[in-house]
A protein has these predicted regions:
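Short C-terminal domain-edge/linker segments immediately following a structured domain
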Residues: 60-66, 112-117, 143-146
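Sec-exported extracytoplasmic/periplasmic mature domains
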Residues: 35, 55-59, 87, 106-109, ...
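N-terminal secretory signal peptides that target proteins for export/translocation
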Residues: 1-3
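Aromatic-Pro/Gly-enriched surface loop or interdomain linker
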Residues: 21-81, 85-89
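An acidic, glycine-rich "communication" segment
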Residues: 26-29, 34, 38, 43-46, ...
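Bacterial N-terminal signal peptides
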Residues: 6-17
Length: 165
């Protein structure tokens, strides 16, 4: 005997059709963290290129508009992913900004940091390491091991490519 539930769900799905999101915030936006000193936007087209690759390789729709956000902005928590770039030394964020970023990351937010100088030991690299140390003083910054799931979640990645190999 077929239950009413088993009949109702397929009929509902057929009537409704494919689920689509209609809100403006349904497309993935990646805001770039804006900071006071240093060059917080050395490559203005970088986010658009990243979002283009996300659209090309996944079913995620993106909003490629340029968006910069300060850590003090109340909408920070609306974005699951934020981007920080630079090539120069910058001053570590204020105590309240560090607290907001720490909370953002602790609650599941993702921060991608792009060292546009491409040099380990550059002024930007040193500033980032100081910032991470201030954010999470008990957790050392370590290289991701080759057996980490990030290297096999969507693609099998045999080697890291790009500027840093």
């Amino acid at each position: 005997m077929v239950s009413l539930f088993k009949l109702t769900i397929p009929l509902l799905l057929f009537k409704i059709g494919i689920a689509t999101a209609y809100a403006d915030y349904s497309n993935l936006s990646i805001p770039q963290i804006k900071y006071k000193d240093g060059d917080s936007n050395p490559h203005p087209t970088a986010i658009g290129s990243l979002l283009g690759q996300i659209e090309r390789r996944t079913s995620i729709e993106t909003d490629r508009g340029s968006l910069q956000i300060e850590l003090s902005h109340p909408n920070l928590y609306q974005y699951p992913f934020v981007y920080m770039a630079g090539s120069e030394e910058f001053e570590i964020f204020s105590g309240s900004e560090l607290e907001r970023l720490r909370n953002y990351l602790s609650y599941g937010g993702f921060l991608l940091i792009d060292n546009n100088s491409s040099n380990i030991g550059s002024k930007f690299d040193i500033s980032v390491r100081k910032m991470i140390g201030a954010l999470f003083p008990q957790i050392p910054l370590n290289k991701i091991s080759r057996d980490h799931s990030i290297f096999r979640s969507f693609y099998l990645i045999d080697r890291v490519s790009g500027r840093m190999q």
